[in-house]
């Protein structure tokens, strides 16, 4: 997986009303993904983690979700 800089991540998130979503799921899991558009019209690939992870692991999972969304945009224009 391509690793992006924090600056690239920030610029990506500031464009097109993007936001990171953490969705709590049954079975002690969370899906973390990037939504795009004012109404969340486009959803990026999800990173699934355990619900009981610490704040540092959660931050890293959010970075991975942003990186996956960045890769998806790079591939599809």
Q: Which residue stretches match the model-derived regions?
A:
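Short interaction-hotspot residues at assembly and binding interfaces
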Residues: 15-72
């Amino acid at each position: 997986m391509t690793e992006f800089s924090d600056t690239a991540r920030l610029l990506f998130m500031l464009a097109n009303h993007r936001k990171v979503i953490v969705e709590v799921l049954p079975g002690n899991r969370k899906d973390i993904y990037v939504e795009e558009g004012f109404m969340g019209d486009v959803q990026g690939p999800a990173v699934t983690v355990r619900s009981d992870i610490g704040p540092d692991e959660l931050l890293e999972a959010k970075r991975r979700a942003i990186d996956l969304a960045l890769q998806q945009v790079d591939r599809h224009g």
